[in-house]
Amino acid sequence: EQKALQLQMNPHFIFNVLNGIKALGNSGKIEELNATISKFSVLLRGILHNSRKEEITLQEEISLLKNYIELAQRMSSKSFTFTIVANLNNTDADEILIPTMLVQPFVENCVQHAFKDTTLGEVSVSFEVKHHFLYCSIIDNGIGIHEAKKRKENSIHNSVSLKVSKERLHILSPKSSFF
């Protein structure tokens, strides 16, 4: 069941990126389009490499997140900056395993929906080890989840990636420390 949910995630993510690339193509910015396609190919290669794995290292996840956010910056109509911080209490990021494609959908949701009314967006992703648990925080200076939900009620948009990710977390939570 976990694998089936993960497989739903990847096509949805790819669809979103391809729509962004299409928009760039329609704008006529050829150099930016080529750079974006190159960045997407690096990201896609990483996703495909990890697609058969149930878990990846935190270092791999951070690398994929960085590639994704850099790609999103290229495609976004709103400017935003990002930071990724790992406070791991002397633990190597290559020693920590997390489920594949678990954090990225939440960052994707933030990038796509948080900055509607913000001049310059900021995204901060942090990983911290406390009491043998890995905590992940995704913070932005956008409109806030309550306002986003209110606006979402008035639209037909349905966040498949968040729904699938929440289902994956629910499946993982009884047997592990993810939630």
Features from the language model and the residues they span:
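Two-component histidine phosphotransfer core
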Residues: E1-F179
